[in-house]
């Protein structure tokens, strides 16, 4: 019998930009990663945004399997921009090591990074 996974994300709109806040503290297991991906994709299917902010302020650990969730979202929003904000040090380091974000704006990466939600919104509005 599979275990029920609590809701892992919630959506809001800030300045006409869809913001998905990941409510999980850790993403370690495949079923949790797939559930998170599916929740975010459902949000995207309902709002059909051209850009997205992922707020990872509550997330303090993401295992390698967790990146499947974020890459699935990236693939779904292929032509749009995704800015990740409020990353803890270890989460930021994992995204950087995996080259999913880049400290060099001239170097393309699948995701953009911002320190705060406000700076993520500002980045997408510029």
Where are these regions (language model features)?
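Residues at the C-termini of beta-strands that transition into short coil/loop
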Residues: 23, 88, 115-118
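A short, charged, amphipathic alpha-helix used as a generic interaction element across diverse proteins
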Residues: 120-126
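STAS-typified acidic loop motif
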Residues: 2-41
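Broad hydrophobic/π-residue packing in well-ordered secondary structure
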Residues: 11, 58-61, 114, 123
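Short acidic-hydrophobic, aromatic-tinged amphipathic segments that line or gate anion-handling sites
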Residues: 106-120
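Amphipathic alpha-helical interaction surfaces in cytosolic regulatory modules
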Residues: 26-107
């Amino acid at each position: 019998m599979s275990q029920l996974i609590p809701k892992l994300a919630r959506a809001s709109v800030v300045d006409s930009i869809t913001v998905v806040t990941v409510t999980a503290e850790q993403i370690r297991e495949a079923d949790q990663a797939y559930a998170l991906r599916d929740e975010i994709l459902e949000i995207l299917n309902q709002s059909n945004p051209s850009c997205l902010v992922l707020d990872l302020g509550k997330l303090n650990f993401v295992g390698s399997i967790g990146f499947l969730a974020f890459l699935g979202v990236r693939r779904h929003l292929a032509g749009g921009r995704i800015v990740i904000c409020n990353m803890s040090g270890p989460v930021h380091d994992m995204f950087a090591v995996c080259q999913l974000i880049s400290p060099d704006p001239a170097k393309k990466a699948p995701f953009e990074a911002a320190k705060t939600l406000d700076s993520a919104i500002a980045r997408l509005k510029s």
